């Protein structure tokens, strides 16, 4: 009789912060994604599908959301200062307590 012992090494990476600043998410499908509390300053969401996504409490200053599909997306308590929202779809989007200072559509 042979006894085989398997040893598995599980590595869990814990990120010190949720920083995704200045990344390019252009033309991606991120339906239902959870970015809550993330640092997304300067990120590009050009023509990105973010329907039903959770972006609550996010730092999105200087981000580009040109043509983004934000239908039913949660952007509550987020900072959207100086964000480009041209052609973005905002039907049903939760913008409560959101800073939209100097943003334009």
Where are these regions (language model features)?
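Positively charged n-region of N-terminal signal peptides that target proteins for export
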Residues: 1-5
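Tandem repeat scaffolds
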Residues: 17-105
């Amino acid at each position: 009789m042979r006894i085989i012992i398997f040893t598995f090494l599980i590595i869990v990476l814990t990120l010190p912060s949720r920083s995704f600043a200045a990344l390019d998410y252009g033309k991606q499908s991120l339906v239902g994604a959870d970015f809550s509390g993330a640092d997304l300053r300067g990120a590009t969401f050009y023509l990105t599908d973010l329907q039903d996504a959770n972006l609550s409490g996010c730092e999105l200053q200087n981000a580009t959301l040109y043509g983004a599909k934000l239908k039913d997306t949660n952007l509550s308590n987020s900072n959207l200062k100086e964000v480009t929202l041209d052609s973005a779809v905002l039907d049903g989007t939760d913008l409560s307590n959101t800073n939209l200072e100097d943003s334009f559509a």
